[in-house]
């Protein structure tokens, strides 16, 4: 049997060489022929051309999936995307390392009844992404380094729900502002929250979260969505702020925080940062480096992947414009936004390539590239173009908007920009921009939203002030800021009718890091209790203190509490300087954190 398959593969190799285009019967195949860095959980996605009888793909023997040692894989067959996409899922995951052969036999037929020419292709299983924490720490260290120069070092830590202060207002557009605070700054620390505010800075909704969260937004279907960093996925809430769904990447990929777009057909778009150990990136660069690629996925209403774009297949690592490729960690794309274009294709923003890329959503091929090393456009009225941008969006007039962080402008400055694109003659004409006076510079994050009345909401990202709203003539009508050193990833403005007397309740049990830390001699310890069941309206809370050896010092708290956020003071006046631990037990939940007493 093995000899038979070897003969079949040999004959197929000859067939492929002789065939002018063995893939001409298919608009899209994923994994791509010859692709590498494929996950063990990968599915095979096939989009046949319209003249293929898609039902013949499900016949026994029409498609075979073979491993490198000629072991045939059994698989399930599913049709998605209105009958246009076939998804094959092997009964058992692939095993790395291996070469996988996908063989299309002459049992696959066209709508006229004729058979296709048999062919096969292969791709390479190289295991799943390496530990994402390596890159998480690396990425955050870059942001923090940029942020330190912007933070007022005298700013105190902000606990609980941060205040949003209006610094200027002159008839802003109606609506509510949706945002979140970034919390993992070295100084000051602050409590992660999901926030909705009115034009006067009053919070109409706030929810303290146990860990960092991002991208609070309203989707076209009316759901409120946000990314929960502790869970590594997006969650959706209804208008009562109740979690009703979750969204995450498929095919073994982790879910990135930068973007979730829910489409009108129930599909959704996400991205994943794919961390790989690369033996050789070419040229004189070091061997054996850790590289972050990007995966763009479209998933259907059943959360099956129906489309996938992988940077490994289309971008070069050397496409990065300002990354130091001599380092051991390389983030060459750093994609941060996805937009469904008016023609149904995709636009993605890749910050570290200084590039907006248009991708054919049917074939997965690149249509054009704007900015960066592979720029195909001529910039008009904007000779320097954009630098390390965020927030690609196609607006109603057909133009695109961006938040230009401007990291490599000289000197650096940030702005909101609008281009009119001629996609035939490849020109990008700057038709509008807003640049604050004096300049505001945000080294990372940020967003631009064109509002219904043609005003523009600008979230300044990793700096203060937090956001502003401007008219098309450049007149500022609103400016708001979080406390100094507290930033927001994005901000949006939408019509929204808040619930009357809505309670601000935590979503989960949590023990929050004490503040200040280090401390002398008093510090505050906070904890949260989510909504409780009807059977139990209170929860017993026990907090104990231990020294660095684990010896019990004292019981700080033993009492019953209802749902909410609480704090308790710990006084270390009678203790020596050193490391201590505080531990909480609330029902089945327990946690321990470290604190440092310095005298």
Predicted regions and their residues:
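Blade-terminus and WD-like Trp-Asp/Gly-His loop motifs, strongest in beta-propeller folds
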Residues: 79-82, 217-219, 263, 516
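Surface-exposed loop/edge segments in extracytoplasmic proteins
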Residues: 69-76, 203-204, 476-477, 551-557, ...
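Acidic, low-complexity Ser/Thr/Gly/Pro-rich repeat segments typical of extracellular/periplasmic
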Residues: 20-132
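Sec-dependent N-terminal signal peptides
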Residues: 3-14
